[in-house]
Regions:
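Pyridoxal 5′-phosphate
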Residues: 1-215
Length: 215
């Protein structure tokens, strides 16, 4: 074991999750974090405190509201720190599906009929359906397909799809379908050469990989 490797104390980690004390779930391992996960006791305690103490309209002129606002600001700052972003670059929403739908509608004003949007068949529906709906407004949707033998997205296949009409490329950072981790930095570099936007779905990667959005 190298000096930079830290052993994971699995027993300690599991002890932080009340679900593993329940006979119905104690012998299971849960990997579908994107679809919903059990949470550790400290998260449960924070949620309980929110529901019983600070579930009010934030940023108003009374003490509980001020505390609620401070808690929201702190949460935003922590998310920003995790991915090396500025706090004004962070928006907390209800779900990735909803956030992508809002984003696609917001970006629609930047597009015109005939502009091209590239999606993949490796992505979760959240980062596909919202962009496919732009076809209703005259945008051309292209699909970057996986290699049928490896289930990987090949960068050369993306090159063949990109054109001077490409405006958006939507791609997952880590596929929860096949487990691939895509080289988002290399993909972004290529997409930016066409003066296009890249939209990365980090749901399956960010909780484990701590991406640096400034890198």
């Amino acid at each position: 074991m190298s000096k930079n490797t830290v052993a994971l104390d699995v027993d300690y980690v599991k002890s932080q999750f009340p679900a593993f004390k329940d006979p119905k779930s104690s012998k299971w391992s849960f990997f579908e974090n994107a679809g919903g996960s059990y949470v550790p006791i400290n998260v449960i305690d924070h949620l309980n405190h929110f529901m019983t103490s600070t579930k009010v309209q934030p940023y108003a002129e009374f003490d509980t509201s001020a505390i609620a606002g401070d808690n929201m600001d702190q949460a935003t700052a922590l998310f920003a720190e995790m991915i090396n972003a500025k706090t004004d670059e962070i928006i907390i929403g209800g779900s990735t599906t909803m956030n992508m739908y809002v984003l696609s509608n917001a970006m629609r004003s930047l597009l015109k009929p005939g502009d091209e949007v590239i999606v993949t068949n490796q992505d979760h529906e959240a980062n596909v359906g919202a962009w496919r709906r732009l076809a209703e407004h005259g945008m051309v949707i292209k699909e970057w397909q996986i290699n049928a033998n490896t289930a990987e997205l090949e960068i050369d296949d993306l090159k063949s799809l990109l054109s001077n009409k490409t405006k958006i490329v939507a791609v997952t950072h880590c596929s929860n379908i096949v487990g691939s981790i895509n080289d988002l930095k290399a993909i972004a570099k290529l997409v930016h050469e066409y003066d296009a936007y890249i939209v990365g779905d980090g749901v399956s990667y960010a909780p484990h990989g701590f991406p640096d959005v400034k890198d």
